[in-house]
């Protein structure tokens, strides 16, 4: 299965994925989400900054899901895995605060990151504010040229 992860542009995480500094993509939610139970080892995740085309892809080597989180469990996850998630040691406490009310977490371990020829995706039917899309084949939503799906 293929997935598209829409990233917060101001966090500048795509270069960290390419360099290997960010080895885990984490998703934190108050309720179960699109990615829950769908991301598996050997899947592919395509990454794009919000408002930009897809420019990076990576394989999935492992997935861990956590539910029924509280502030203590959130803190344990962030302190254990935050460094591999591209979070600097000086930012760990900020992220503990940011995620303290989240009830679900997915850790997606990335492998073989690479740049791809930039392409846009058609998010119609997925919700305009959606930050994660799971689809059997990326070509179903890949846009080439002026809004023509491949």
PLM region descriptions:
Residues 48-59:
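Short coil-to-beta-strand transition motifs
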